[in-house]
Amino acid sequence: MNWIKFSKWADVLDSEDGKYEFPCVYVLTEKDGTPLYIGKAATKRRVKGGTTWSGGLRQRYYHDWTVLDACMKGTGRHIFIAKVDQRKASAIEKQLIYENKPEYNENGKTTAPKTSWVLIHKGTRPKMKKGLA
């Protein structure tokens, strides 16, 4: 997993990488990179009724960017994002939640997922309890 680190949600929107309109796993962290919340955005860009809809993380939080930035201001917290295969996004999210047990994830911390992989973390990455660096 090739992680990219951001300090503001607005920076994700302004990034050069397609504004994250693709399937990804994201981690909201403390200053030191410890996961607080792990999620996925697995919807690809699509066309519905002649209108093109954004996909991925941009669609997931489209109306909440400024609120999320306001909540994060001055905290030193970060957002880490890794592009993933849409078919594996849910399984990877479940595995990361189970292994790291982030404070703000309500589900998935006690039951092991049905499938798991050896995840290799690259780039500027969050502080994960498992996986290869």
Language-model segment annotations:
Residues M1-L36, K40-A133:
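Boundary/linker segments flanking structured domains
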